[in-house]
């Protein structure tokens, strides 16, 4: 660390000299020598050190971190030694420019010639790093872009081009000279961005000097120069990096998308090939003769082909230029009389929409997936093929469009998230380094303190970076001495060579501006100086105080740099050090701080100069975040605080020399932080002084008193309330403007505007007086207000000069002032602000992409649009969408980004050829729309959190508006209470009721029928939020706490933006909590509390735990708890619906029952009929159930209760609901013609009504009114039954034809809603939706506010300008403005009645109409007509002219970006967020599990669901066995998959117009494949026998094979009546899913499919809900729009005449497609658009629509289906995708366990679940990664300590568990999980053989080793004895005297016997070598055999002979051991 503590200043930077280069070379040589040694070590298996990495904040092109200080001026632009230690062994040097940007260069020779010290290269480096150089290049590029955007450049621009080329050449030359060309790192071509420069220059010269024909195509490449901006601006590089990363991540999704689209395209090809060419052709007659000519309408054609290809003979669709398609199937479109359906001409849309070949089918499917103009394709296909094929489109839309497109979003979002995490990790890394540095400083500081050294006095001088060098030198010497001192224990000493690397002074620290980065994610970090705080949640607890901080937070500052060390009074001790802080010292500066304009906070009460300890001076002031807006100068609401140290105290420092010691590093850090603070300053000090002098007005006492009074008024909450009301009124006034206003109305609006302008000006003036300008302009809102006021005043001044409606638009910004008091709007604006901030670079990238493609389009296609315009435009004018000039090219690209690409692409393909257009358009679509826009959306979602949406204000206090409202409420409450008391006083003289009666009348509500205890959720409910209130005042006559009172639980009130602000000043939070806890304790202890106000009663206690009296026995009560009765007919109990947590626990039911023993009757009893209030007010409601009439009534109720609760009753009601809903579907336009059905339906309707009324009455009697009417689902039932009842009564009385009754009848369409509560799946979804409704409504409201601004602006711009004069005879085409100029001329010319003035149906004539227009623009449906009208508009009621107002397009572009893109996507954000919140509420273990635990839990979950399978036994027959071996090989499967894919390819080759030869060949190929697959099937059946049918895949194959054979045989019949039999072959593609498991590389795709599988159940529920919504709306549509005129989107097939047709229309607009076309005819109100008197089949008249009903119908449907339900679908996919990705990144996946069991089958063919210990090693080696343990693996397996059962067998669970543990690592949770798993496994496999381990692998090894040790020891012992005995015998034989047999060591026993034998046999003289090595020691076996009686070794202990064989006796070895 000593290295770290080098001083700052010049010594950090050393010039790069030849010596430096030599030093680097020396280090490189050393490293190489070390490297060879290291590689040797690694071969020996020693751990390698972690390789060093380049430091992130010292990377090239980053700014030098502040800690390194400022380089001296003379070193700027000069080569310096590299600061990053990573490059210490590489030939590099760095250069810094004035902006301290790092440039890194290679120190090798550039171009072999120029060394780093060559003057030419130095000059080039100086130029390159200079900021002016990059500015010059930037300006050149921008100028070049301007020139490129000219569509018809003048001739002189050629010379400008040469200039540009010269500048780019010069740039590249400088770079090459400075960096070198390409050989080494950091040279020119090593940077990919330079490749771009290089290619641009090469292209420029190539086009100039070589003639290459089509120059415009090559000129197009020049547009790539725009990309150079990215290489110049470093911020863009990172975003592009993120884009490239996300594109890489998209690979899997792209593969899956292409695969799915290919499958769907194949299906489309087979189903619809050639269908779209069927047209309605005029009838003709064939003329007799040989030439085949035909005649029609008296005209003769040469041949039938010529006739069929003549467009004049086709019938056109009504009101369009499209040909009417038709089909030959029964439900396809039909032709009118005089026409027949024939295959003729080309396909629709210039021939580009078709399924005639695979390529066109694929394009059609891609278009379907991106949902561009898909309704057109849908209508064309259904008209030509039949309505049944709606199913195909549903599949493609739901699987393709919703799933795949959103997967792309999910992947891009995840890539962004990962990058974000990486940024956070990088900052954490820096922080860690910083912490290490701080530890070091602390140690040094403590060391100095112990020595008694003054550690502070340095700071004054040496905090300055200009401290003299001599000081630095002296300090570094001193530090060297210090760091080798005893206190540090030598731990921090570094090798000498390190301290010599001077330039790398602060390497270990490398702290950047990361300090103040606010974009980080919040996270808790102890001792962190990096504040990870969400931008929008200011926290007051930066320095903890008791009031608003937790212990954890204050603790987190313990080691923080920014908190002063505890203060100490100097009087106690002169010696500086750490001690206790001064008593009562305030650390949190909330109450006593001021903020200056720089955001620096001074603590006013932070102690005086004497009270400051040395510690507090280590740091100068630093602010990490700017303080938020302050309301008053003296008050600083929650925000980051900061302490300003006082002047240093010099007392107590005796040693003069101490002033020059230590803390150099502290000065480094301090000055770095000081610089950081300076960088945050908003204004320089001189401005600061000026502002404080002139902008704070405190002149005289009179002024001050006026100021105080004004302040009192202005700052009062009521002033805010008044201003807010004025804003709302002003907005209302602006919204009242409309077309055709009367003069009086207009004048009123103008006066209103003047008044409001006056009010807002006055507000601003008074606020400036009250606050002084200095403080007024420190608040963002005030600045905003002042700007708007100034603009309003400007507008007043300028309005006389002309119509400046643009300035009027600025008034609209006042609406945003609402955000101040409306948190949701505020949050939303912040979200958009944050996103736009974060999106700055991304927006720039998008702009560059749009620019590039616009220029490319203009260069490539521009000319073609003008030359070949006749192909796409009948009028001869240029079409609206063309690429002739840059603006129009930009519009086309923007339109593609909006998702509309296909129509403009058709035009392009017509004029410019197919290939190039396809390439450009699809590139823009994929890059721009799918990637960049999804990245936008990902950023938007990431800055979104609904916690903020519902949170109150940031500082946790109420804002002024809420205070004002609370005051008003308090006033009203006071008035109410006073009035109440007064009335009670008057009534008090009445005699009281007897107490007994009062008590009795109160009993029934809660206690009269004792209930079973509440469910666990209620019992364990968390304490309610602080919104819960208890009324303090008691109402008279409510009894006392001693009375028998009901236990009632208040429900937590729902949150809203302006909540009931009852926590007023008089009722503080503390007392409130005391009160509630007191009441809670009363309840729990069995006491009773007074009843609350009715609205606070809990439905929980009344319903959930009700359903009658519980029995006295505790056991029964327990049973009741487990199976609680519920009212299924009414759906969910309110406990689910309303209450999240109740405040009080229920009293113990057993105690209650003891109190009232006589009521413990049957549990299945109903509740009371009436609420307690009713009983109290009407005692007659109280029935005595013990007497005769009451008893009968009670029995009746019990009977009804049993009926209603019976499951059969519920089933019957569901059946009736479905029947009645189904009956509604028959009430269509043809009902009058079908008399029988009509009569049947009438009777059925009556029957249903009676049944439902009966059900309702039964439920009333059974449940009582109280329970029935406190349940939302029951209310729904009640209302729907009422509608049926009223319509039935009206029918009976003959009022059926009355208008109101008719409209009431349409409400019967709501009947299916009753099914909601009965179907669990739908109810779950609805509950989730209901939970999200508050947030959704919030966002909807905010969207409406946003849109209001655009709508008012639209009214200002376009009101009255959308009209035009039309000539009816010319087919509704507007006349030229030269003929008719305006509305009055049109009316005056209208003599014949053929001219009339009309308006575009959707216009901006008022704000309401504007909203509808904006909805069409935002959903991109019908927006073209609106835009065209706006662009063509000239003036008020003037005839439009083609593109007269061209730049009005910009209004729509801006609206689409802010109004559509941001606001509509917020819906996804809100819904996802709500899902997550609800998950948190419901989520159990997920939230309480650590990441580690989750990992184990998931692995175990997968593991437990598997068990070993018995493999299919191999046949005994030799041939069958051979086939079996082939069939079961993986290669066989892969081969079959390959053949399937090949089969698909042959299917792709088919086209509609193929030749007979091709048809023949393909048929034969098909037969071949059918034969192959049939063969496969037969072979498998032969090999696998009856086991073949045990596998579902095999059954699937079998069915497909049978179908293929049938299809081939009966192809003609099937094709004629059904569809092409080749479709069966497509089904076979499903088998590809099977092979994905085998391919390791397909893991990503498996994850995606897994995400889909996980989503399916939820998606099914959402689909059901969507179907229900569609059903209801289609019934409404049939009732209201059946007879609407056919035009636009409504025709003979797509209409509301029948249920089926309505469903077709509604499915189409579920994705919002074509809803404008369906709405258009409904907006017709009278002639000439429709005929109000046309008679209809049901007796009504007219084919006009009803605009109000139509608009309501379509807008609500779009909001419900498109914005909510479809977004729920998206939310689920995103959620499951992240879950699936998590699963796939887990170390062990499902596949790994599958693989384990597959291998297991081979080792355990009988599925005994055990394998032999001997086989374990092979088994472990046979597995695949990550479970595999490769051989040699004996030791690893032994260490696993696996339990073994008798017979040396090991259980599969034990093995799997051990292997899993090895992969996941050790963890404390493993044991608990193991027990769980074993229990689970036992339960799943009851047949398991008794499992009692007798030993383990480790114990077995221990035993073996022990045995070996014992053997060896015994052998050695024997050997020693033998040697002794041999020695004795030898000596004896040699004739030593005195040796008798008695002296022998071994007189008897085996050794003596054998030795004596040996020696006695010898005849010759004994030599030393004659002792046979085999003769002794005796073998172990013989010893044990002979002496088994007397030796304590049992052979049975070593059960296996191998153990002994392992260790053969080796005398040599033993001899050595003795020696």
Curated annotation (Swiss-Prot):
It is a multi-pass membrane protein. IV repeats lie at residues 1512-1809. GO terms for molecular function: calmodulin binding; scaffold protein binding; ubiquitin protein ligase binding; voltage-gated sodium channel activity; voltage-gated sodium channel activity involved in cardiac muscle cell action potential; voltage-gated sodium channel activity involved in SA node cell action potential. It is found in: Cell membrane; Cytoplasm, Perinuclear region; Cell membrane, Sarcolemma, T-tubule; Cell junction. The modification Dimethylated arginine is found at residue 526. Residues 1903-1932 form the IQ domain. Residues 507-528 have a biased composition (Polar residues). The modification Phosphothreonine is found at residues 38, 486. The sequence contains 4 internal repeats, each with 5 hydrophobic segments (S1, S2, S3, S5, S6) and one positively charged segment (S4). Segments S4 are probably the voltage-sensors and are characterized by a series of positively charged amino acids at every third position. The IQ domain mediates association with calmodulin. PANTHER family: SODIUM CHANNEL PROTEIN TYPE 5 SUBUNIT ALPHA, VOLTAGE-GATED CATION CHANNEL CALCIUM AND SODIUM. This is Sodium channel protein type 5 subunit alpha. It comes from Mus musculus. The lineage of its organism: Eukaryota, Metazoa, Chordata, Craniata, Vertebrata. The gene is Scn5a.
């Amino acid at each position: 660390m000593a290295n770290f503590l080098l001083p700052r200043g010049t010594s950090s930077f050393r010039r790069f000299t030849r010596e430096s280069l030599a030093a680097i070379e020396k280090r490189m040589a050393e490293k190489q020598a070390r490297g060879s040694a290291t590689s040797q070590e690694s071969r020996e298996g020693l751990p390698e050190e972690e390789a060093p990495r380049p430091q992130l904040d010292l990377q090239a092109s980053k700014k030098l971190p502040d800690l390194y200080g400022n380089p001296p001026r003379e070193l700027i632009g000069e080569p310096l030694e590299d600061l990053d230690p990573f490059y210490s062994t590489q030939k590099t040097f760095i250069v810094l420019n004035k902006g301290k940007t790092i440039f890194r260069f290679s120190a090798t020779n550039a171009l072999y010639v120029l060394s780093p010290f060559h003057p030419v290269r130095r000059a080039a480096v100086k130029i390159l790093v200079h900021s002016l150089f990059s500015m010059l290049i930037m300006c050149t590029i921008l100028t070049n872009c301007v020139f490129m955007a000219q569509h018809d450049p003048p001739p002189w621009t050629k010379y400008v081009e040469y200039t540009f080329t010269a500048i780019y050449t010069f740039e590249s030359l400088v770079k090459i000279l400075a960096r070198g060309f390409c050989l080494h790192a950091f040279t020119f071509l090593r940077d990919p961005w330079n490749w771009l420069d290089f290619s641009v220059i090469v292209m420029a010269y190539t086009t100039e000097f070589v003639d290459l024909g089509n120059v415009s195509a090559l000129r197009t490449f020049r547009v790539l120069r725009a990309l150079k901006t990215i290489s110049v601006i470093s911020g863009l590089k990172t975003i592009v990096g993120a884009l490239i990363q996300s594109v890489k991540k998209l690979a899997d999704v792209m593969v899956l998308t292409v695969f799915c689209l290919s499958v769907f395209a194949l299906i489309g090809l087979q189903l619809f090939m050639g269908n779209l060419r069927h047209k309605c052709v005029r009838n003709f007659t064939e003329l007799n003769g040989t030439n085949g000519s035909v005649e029609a309408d008296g005209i003769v054609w040469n041949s039938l082909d010529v006739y069929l290809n003549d467009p004049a003979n086709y019938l056109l669709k009504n009101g369009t230029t499209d040909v009417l398609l038709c089909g030959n199937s029964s439900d396809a479109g039909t032709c009118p009389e005089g026409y027949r359906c024939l295959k003729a001409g080309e396909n629709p849309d210039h021939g580009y929409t078709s399924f005639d070949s695979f390529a066109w089918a694929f394009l059609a499917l891609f278009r379907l997936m991106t949902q561009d103009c898909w309704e057109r394709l849908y209508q064309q296909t259904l008209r030509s093929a039949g309505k049944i094929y709606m199913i195909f489109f549903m599949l493609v839309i739901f699987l393709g469009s919703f799933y795949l497109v959103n997967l792309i979003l999910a992947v891009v979002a995840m890539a962004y998230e990962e990058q974000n995490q990486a940024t956070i990790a990088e900052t954490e890394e820096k922080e860690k380094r910083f912490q290490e540095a701080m530890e070091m400083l602390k140690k040094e500081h403590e060391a100095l303190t112990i020595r008694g050294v003054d550690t502070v006095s340095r700071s004054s001088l040496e905090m300055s970076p200009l401290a003299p060098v001599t000081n630095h030198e002296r300090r570094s010497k001193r530090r060297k001495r210090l760091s080798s001192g005893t206190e540090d224990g030598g731990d921090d000493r570094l090798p000498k060579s390190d301290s010599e690397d001077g330039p790398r002074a602060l390497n270990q620290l490398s702290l950047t501006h990361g300090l103040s980065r606010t974009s980080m994610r919040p996270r808790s970090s102890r001792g962190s100086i990096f504040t990870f705080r969400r931008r929008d949640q200011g926290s007051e607890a930066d320095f903890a105080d008791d009031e608003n901080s937790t212990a954890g937070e204050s603790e987190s500052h313990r080691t923080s740099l920014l908190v002063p060390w505890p203060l100490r009074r100097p009087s106690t001790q002169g010696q500086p050090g750490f001690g206790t802080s001064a008593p009562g010292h305030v650390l949190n500066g909330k109450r006593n701080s001021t903020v200056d304009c720089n955001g620096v906070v001074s603590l006013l009460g932070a102690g005086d100069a004497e009270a400051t300890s040395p510690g507090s001076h280590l740091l100068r002031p630093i602010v990490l975040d700017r303080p938020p807006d302050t309301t008053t100068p003296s008050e600083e609401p929650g925000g980051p605080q900061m302490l300003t140290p006082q002047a240093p105290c010099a007392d107590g420092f005796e040693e003069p020399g101490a002033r020059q010691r230590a803390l150099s590093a502290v000065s480094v850090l301090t000055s770095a932080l000081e610089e950081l603070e300076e960088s945050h300053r908003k204004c320089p000090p001189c401005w600061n002084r000026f502002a404080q002098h002139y902008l704070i007005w405190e002149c005289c006492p009179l002024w001050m008193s006026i100021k105080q009074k004004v302040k009192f008024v202005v700052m009062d909450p009521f002033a805010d309330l008044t201003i807010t009301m004025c804003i709302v009124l002003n907005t209302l006034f602006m919204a009242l403007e409309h077309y055709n206003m009367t003069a009086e109305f207009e004048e009123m609006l103008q006066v209103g505007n003047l008044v409001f302008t006056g009010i807002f000006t006055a507000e601003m003036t008074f606020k400036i007086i009250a606050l002084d300008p200095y403080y007024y302009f420190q608040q963002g809102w005030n600045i905003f207000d002042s700007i708007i006021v100034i603009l309003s005043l400007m507008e007043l001044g300028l309005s006389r000069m002309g119509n400046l409606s643009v300035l009027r638009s600025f008034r609209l910004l006042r609406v945003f002032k609402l955000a101040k008091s409306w948190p949701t709007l505020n949050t939303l604006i912040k979200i958009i602000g944050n996103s736009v901030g974060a999106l700055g670079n991304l927006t720039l990238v998008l702009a560059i992409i749009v620019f590039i493609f616009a220029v490319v389009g203009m260069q490539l296609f521009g000319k073609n649009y003008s030359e070949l315009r006749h192909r796409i435009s009948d009028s001869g004018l240029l079409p609206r969408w063309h690429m002739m000039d840059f603006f129009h090219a930009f519009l086309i690209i923007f339109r593609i980004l909006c998702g509309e690409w296909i129509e403009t692409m058709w035009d392009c393909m017509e004029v410019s050829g197919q290939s190039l257009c396809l390439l450009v358009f699809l590139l823009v679509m994929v890059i721009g729309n799918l990637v960049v826009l999804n990245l936008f959306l990902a950023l938007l979602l990431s800055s979104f959190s609904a916690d903020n949406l519902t949170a109150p204000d940031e500082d946790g206090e109420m804002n002024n508006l809420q205070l004002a409202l609370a005051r008003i409420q308090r006033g009203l409450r006071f008035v109410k209470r006073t009035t109440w008391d007064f009335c009670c006083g008057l009534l008090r003289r009445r005699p009281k009721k007897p107490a007994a009666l009062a008590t009795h009348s109160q009993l029934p509500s809660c206690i009269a029928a004792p209930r079973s205890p509440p469910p666990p959720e209620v019992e364990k409910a968390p304490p309610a939020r602080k919104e819960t209130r208890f009324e303090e005042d008691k109402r008279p006559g409510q009894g006392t706490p001693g009375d028998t009172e009901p236990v009632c639980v208040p429900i937590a009130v729902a949150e809203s933006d302006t909540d009931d602000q009852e926590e007023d000043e008089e009722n503080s939070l503390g007392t409130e909590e005391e009160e509630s806890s007191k009441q809670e304790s009363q309840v729990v202890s069995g006491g009773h509390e007074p009843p609350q106000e009715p609205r606070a009663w809990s439905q929980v206690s009344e319903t959930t735990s009700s359903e009658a009296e519980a029995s006295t026995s505790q056991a029964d009560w327990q049973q009741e708890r487990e199976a609680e009765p519920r009212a299924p007919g009414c759906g969910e109990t309110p406990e689910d619906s309303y209450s999240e947590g109740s405040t009080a626990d229920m009293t113990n039911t057993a105690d209650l029952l003891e109190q009232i023993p006589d009521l413990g009757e049957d549990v299945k009893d109903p509740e009371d009929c009436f609420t307690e209030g009713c009983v109290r007010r009407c005692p007659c409601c109280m029935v005595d159930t013990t007497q005769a009439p009451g008893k009968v009534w009670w029995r009746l109720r019990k009977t009804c209760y049993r009926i209603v609760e019976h499951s059969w009753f519920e089933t019957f009601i569901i059946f009736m609901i479905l029947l009645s809903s189904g009956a509604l579907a028959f009430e269509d336009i043809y009902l009058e013609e079908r008399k029988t059905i009509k009569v049947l339906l009438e009777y059925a309707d009556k029957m249903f009504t009676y049944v439902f009324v009966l059900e309702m009455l039964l439920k009333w009697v059974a449940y009582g009114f109280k329970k029935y009417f406190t349940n939302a689902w029951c209310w729904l039932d009640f209302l729907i039954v009422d509608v049926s009842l009223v319509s039935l009564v009206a029918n009976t009385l003959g009022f059926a034809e009355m208008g109101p009754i008719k409209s009431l009848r349409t409400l019967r369409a709501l009947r299916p809603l009753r099914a909601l509560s009965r179907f669990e799946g739908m109810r779950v979804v609805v509950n989730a939706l209901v939970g999200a409704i508050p947030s959704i409504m919030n966002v909807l409201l905010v969207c409406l506010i946003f849109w209001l601004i655009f709508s008012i602006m639209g009214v200002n711009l376009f009101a009255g300008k959308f009209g035009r004069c039309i000539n009816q005879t010319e087919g509704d085409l507007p006349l030229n403005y030269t003929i008719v100029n305006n509305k009055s001329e049109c009316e005056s010319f209208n003599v014949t009645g053929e001219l009339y003035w009309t308006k575009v149906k959707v216009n901006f004539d008022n704000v309401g109409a504007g909203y509808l227009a904006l909805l069409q623009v935002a959903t991109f449906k019908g927006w073209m007509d609106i835009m065209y009208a706006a662009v063509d508009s000239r003036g008020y009621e003037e005839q439009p002219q083609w593109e007269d107002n061209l730049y009005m397009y910009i209004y729509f572009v801006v609206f689409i970006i802010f109004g559509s893109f941001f606001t509509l996507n917020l819906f996804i954000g809100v819904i996802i967020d709500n899902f997550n919140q609800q998950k948190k509420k419901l989520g159990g273990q997920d939230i309480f599990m650590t990441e580690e635990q989750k990992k184990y839990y998931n692995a175990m979950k997968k593991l437990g669901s598997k068990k070993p399978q018995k493999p299919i036994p191999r046949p005994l027959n030799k041939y069958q066995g051979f086939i079996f071996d082939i069939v079961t090989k993986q290669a066989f499967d892969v081969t079959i998959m390959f053949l399937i894919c090949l089969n698909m390819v042959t299917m792709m080759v088919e086209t509609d117009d193929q030749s007979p030869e091709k048809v023949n060949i393909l048929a034969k190929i098909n037969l071949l494949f059918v034969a192959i697959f049939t063969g496969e099937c037969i072979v498998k059946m032969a090999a696998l026998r009856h086991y073949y049918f045990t596998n579902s895949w095999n059954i699937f194959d079998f069915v497909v094979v049978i179908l293929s054979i049938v299809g081939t045989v009966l192809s003609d019949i099937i094709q004629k009546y059904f569809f092409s039999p080749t479709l069966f072959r497509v089904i076979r593609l499903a088998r590809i899913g099977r092979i994905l498991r085998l391919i390791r590389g397909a893991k990503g795709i498996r994850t995606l499919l897994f995400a889909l599988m996980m989503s399916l159940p939820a998606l099914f529920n959402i689909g059901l809900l969507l179907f229900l919504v569609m059903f209801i709306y289609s019934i409404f549509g049939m009732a209201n729009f059946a007879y609407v005129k056919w035009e636009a989107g409504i025709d003979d097939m797509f209409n509301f005449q029948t249920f089926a047709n309505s469903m077709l229309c509604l499915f189409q607009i579920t994705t919002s497609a074509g809803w404008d076309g369906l709405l258009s005819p409904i907006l017709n109100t009278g002639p000439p658009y429709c005929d109000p008197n046309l008679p209809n089949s049901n007796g009504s008249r007219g084919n006009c629509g009803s605009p109000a009903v139509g608009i309501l119908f379509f807008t609500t449907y779009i909001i419900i289906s498109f914005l909510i339900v479809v977004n729920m679908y998206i939310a689920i996919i995103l959620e499951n995708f992240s879950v699936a990705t998590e699963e796939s990144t887990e170390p062990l996946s499902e596949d790994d366990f599958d693989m384990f069991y597959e291998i297991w089958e081979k080792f355990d063919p009988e599925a005994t679940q055990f394998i032999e210990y001997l086989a374990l090693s092979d088994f472990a080696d046979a597995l695949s990664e990550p479970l595999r343990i490769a051989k040699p693996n004996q030791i690893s397996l032994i260490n696993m300590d696996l339990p073994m059962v008798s017979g040396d067998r090991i259980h599969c669970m034990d093995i799997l568990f051990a292997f899993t543990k090895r992969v996941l690592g050790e963890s404390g949770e493993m044991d608990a999980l193991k027990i769980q798993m074993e229990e689970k496994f036992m339960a799943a496999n009851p047949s398991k053989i008794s499992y009692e381990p007798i030993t383990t692998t480790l114990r077995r090894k221990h035993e073996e080793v022990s045995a070996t040790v014992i053997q060896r020891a015994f052998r050695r012992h024997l050997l020693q004895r033998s040697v002794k005995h041999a020695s004795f015998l030898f000596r004896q034989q040699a004739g030593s005297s005195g040796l008798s047999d008695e002296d022998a060591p071994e007189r008897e026993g085996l050794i003596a016997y054998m030795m004596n034998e040996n020696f006695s046999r010898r005849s010759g003289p004994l030599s030393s070598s004659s002792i046979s090595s085999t003769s002794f020691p005796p073998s172990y076996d013989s010893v044990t055999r002979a002496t088994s009686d007397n030796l304590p070794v049992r052979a049975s202990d070593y059960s296996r002979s191998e153990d002994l064989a392992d260790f053969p006796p080796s005398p040599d070895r033993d001899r050595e051991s003795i020696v």
